[in-house]
Amino acid sequence: MADNLLSEQLLQRLQDGDNKGVDTLELAAVLSVDHQQVVGAVKSLQCLGEIIEAEQRSSKKWELSSEGEEIAQVGSHEARVFQSLPKEGLLQAELMKLPFAKVGFSKAMSNKWIRLDKAAAGGPCVYRVVETIEDTVKEKLQLILKGRADDVNEKDKNELKKRKLVNEVTVKSYWVTKGSGFSTSITKQETDLTPEMIASGSWREKQFKGYNFNALGVMPECGHLHPLLKVRTQFRQIFLEMGFTEMPTNNFIESSFWNFDALFQPQQHPARDQHDTFFLQDPALATEFPMEYLERVKKVHSEGGYGSQGYKYDWSIHEAQKNILRTHTTAVSARMLYKLAHQKEFTPVKYFSIDRVFRNETLDATHLAEFHQIEGVVADRGLTLGNLMGVLKEFFHKLGITKLRFKPAYNPYTEPSMEVFSYHEGLKKWVEVGNSGLFRPELLLPMGLPGDVNVLGWGLSLERPTMIRYGIKNIRELVGHKVNLQMVYDSPICRLDAC
């Protein structure tokens, strides 16, 4: 039905209504048209001036879900289960093959329409308990379908909603009344001023449709940032606000020396196994190392030193030479701390990095072989565990995380070490959000850092907060070839506001 015909019918009803108004929902029902078509006619009339007045109203309405519509036609699952049972009964295994039996069986049992005989010959068998039933679920759904939801009490409607058979929706409609310039005759308004109108002068006698400056225009084509990049930018901004300097993280390939040995991680540690680490085939080995530093690392591993007993094993340079895809960005931190140790005079520093790391892990909904690590490092004289907790509280507060707990943990290269937990309001439980600790003397002193210098460090992944922020449950929907590009186009700006 064309908009102009609907507009004429609306005006005629106002004319015949003795100054009473017209409800667009009622008009749509009377004319058997979609409500949005009537709304379109109202909008068109509003553009003509003061012909009508329209007041927007909101009301609640109950609608059937697709499953509810099916039940309104063929009956509830429990009724169909009852009707499927012959008088002599039916094996439960056969009954459960029916598509509606999974829900219908339990409902029919709770209604005491059927019973289950587990001791029957041939296996558990289901029998009727009553001769006839009344399918009240179907009856209530049919009432709602006919627009008589008020005839169904609230308890029953909530039960139907719990079963996902109905939904309560908010419906916006208009109450239309006559305007100051009301008329039943509609003069066509021009939408374009043409060269012919100007040449002939006919534009003087024509009425032009006014511009709607509130109308939404066509969105311009532009680039879009992936949610990971948006959250990464927000994290980076937080670090910069706290006075941190970003570390260069362009080396995806690291030697095992910088990735493991320099961090006082023993060569027999399970994390260095091929089941957890990607080893390079070509070039397989690194050849350039600061040899004096390498010898000090070898000694602290095999013999101990700096107040440590070490690990007491035969340290192998061949194992340290193996090239790998870095398993953490702490390898970058190790290089930066070594560089810091060789400055003429020690100066306190605050470093951070956000970049990719690689683990040979089993892929699932929350784990990938490639992901991002966020890391913060603070080096200064006299730092303590209390300083670490203070920095962490400030950092996570800027992320909007204020409820924190710290739990003792073990890391090869930090002591003491702490896992950081935050209370998740949605899950109603404490969840791990990061790991932290003070770098061990066995890591710092071989580098050449002064003995009174302590280094705080902590890290977390980028993917987990991004998934939480954007409500993504499967990491494959965030990263990889299955990413829905529309999600990238529509994702809002990331704001990690402090509470």
From Swiss-Prot:
Q: Which family does it belong to?
A: Belongs to the class-II aminoacyl-tRNA synthetase family. Phe-tRNA synthetase alpha subunit type 2 subfamily.
Q: Name one GO cellular component term.
A: phenylalanine-tRNA ligase complex
The cofactor(s) it depends on are: Mg(2+)
Q: Which residues bind L-phenylalanine?
A: 330, 373-375, 413, 439
One GO process term, biological-process aspect: protein heterotetramerization
Signal sequence, renumbered to the chain: none
- Where is it mainly found? cytoplasm
The organism named in the record is Xenopus laevis
The protein's matches in PANTHER family, at most eight in alphabetical order, are given as: PHENYLALANINE--TRNA LIGASE ALPHA SUBUNIT (PTHR11538:SF40), PHENYLALANYL-TRNA SYNTHETASE (PTHR11538)
Q: Recite the UniProt keywords alphabetically.
A: Aminoacyl-tRNA synthetase, ATP-binding, Cytoplasm, Ligase, Magnesium, Metal-binding, Nucleotide-binding, Protein biosynthesis
Catalytic activity, EC: 6.1.1.20
Subcellular location as annotated: Cytoplasm
**Stored InterPro entries:** aa-tRNA-synth_II, aa-tRNA-synth_II/BPL/LPL, Phe-tRNA-synth_IIc_asu, Phenylalanyl-tRNA_Synthase, PheRS_DBD1, PheRS_DBD2, PheRS_DBD3
Q: Name one GO molecular function term.
A: phenylalanine-tRNA ligase activity
Enzyme superclass (EC): ligase
Q: Which residues bind Mg(2+)?
A: 415
Q: What does the record note on quaternary structure? A: Heterotetramer; dimer of two heterodimers formed by alpha and beta subunits.
Tell me the protein's name: Phenylalanine--tRNA ligase alpha subunit B
Q: Name one Pfam family in it.
A: PheRS_DBD3
Q: Which reaction does it catalyse?
A: tRNA(Phe) + L-phenylalanine + ATP = L-phenylalanyl-tRNA(Phe) + AMP + diphosphate + H(+)
Under SUPFAM superfamilies, the record lists: Class II aaRS and biotin synthetases
- Keyword Magnesium appears in the UniProt entry: yes
